[in-house]
Amino acid sequence: MPVTRKLRTSLLSASALAGAAALVLQTALPAQAAVDFDVTATVETAPVSHSGDAADDPAIWVHPDDPAKSVVVGTDKKGALEVYDLKGARLQRIDGDHGNNVDVRGDVVVSADDEAAGGDGALHVYRIDPATRRLKHLKDVPTEVTAHGVCLYRSPQSGKLYAYPNSTSGRVEQWELAVSGDSVTATSVRLFDAGSAVEGCYADESNGKLYLGEEDVGVWVYGAEPGAGTARTKLDSTGSGGHLTADTEGIAAAGNRLFVSSQGSNDFTVYDRRSGAYLGRFGVASGAAADDCEDTDGIDATATGLGSAFPKGVFICQDGSNGAPGSSGNQNFKFVPLERITDRV
C-alpha cells in the first residue's frame, strides 16, 4: 500500500505515543523525506471512466494558433484514451486503447499499450485536429518490447520523429515514425536493456538526452539519437544518497526545470534542466479547487502560456486517490499553475 500524504500525517501523530510504540511505527515504514513546500491545483479533470488503478499518464498538446484551446491527453489503462480541455472537461474518449503512457510531439500523439497485439504490446499512433481538438487513429505499431511506457523525440539533427517504448523487463526500443498525412511508416532503430523495470521517460530536444526512470533504482540519462548506443550516466537515485523514493515514475520538463515523480513518497523532485543539479522537492496538497496528488504515476509540464488560466504554463500530475474537494471517485489528473512551483525552486 502506498504511503499517502494523509497516512503520513497520521503517522506523524504517533510521536505522541510511548517510545516503544513509536519505534515500531518508525521501523515498519520507509523514511519519508520532507518536502520543501506544497502547492495546490486550480483545476482537475473529470474522473477517468474505469475504477481502480486506471489513470496513469498525461500529455499536453499546445494548440498552434490559440494556446487557450490546448488539451491534455490522459491514459485510462483499463481501456480508454481521454482528451480534456483546460477546465478539465472531457472532450473525447477513445475506447479500446489500454495505453499505459502517452506522449505528444506536434500534432502526433502516441500511446503505449502493453495489452495490444495479444499482450505483446504496440504503439497506437494518432493525429490531433486543431479545428476539432479530437484524435484520429492512424496506425498500430507492434513493438519488440512489451510497450509499457513511451516518450517522443523530434531530432534537432535530422528532423525525424522517434518513439521510445519501454517495458517492465527493462528493455527499451527506439522507433523512427515517419508520419505523412494519415500514413505512418515505423522502423525499429535501436534496442537496449536498462536493467530492471522502467516506465517513465522523457526525451529532451534541447540537449539531446533521453531520461529513463528505472523504478527501483533511479533516473538514467542516455543519448536520444539512434546512434547513441548504451552509454549512460545517473541523474539521481532511490534510497540512501539519493533524492528519489521508489517507484520512480513520471518525468517531464518545462523551461529550465526537470521534474520527476516519486510514487512512494507522493512528491516531486526538481532539477536544473541544463546541469542536472538537484534543486528541491515539492508536493501537491489539497486546496480550494481540488484535492492533493497521491500515489502519482505520470506527469507532464509546459512553460508555454496557455491563456488566462495558465499564463506561465502548467504542471500536471496523475492522482491515484481522487477525493473531495472537487470531483471524487475514479482517478484523475490535477493541473497546477507552473509559477506556483518555479517561483519557489
Regions found by a protein language model. Give the residues of each.
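Secretory targeting and sorting signals
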Residues: M1-A33
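Sequence/structural signature of beta-propeller domains
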Residues: P2-T9, Q32-V345
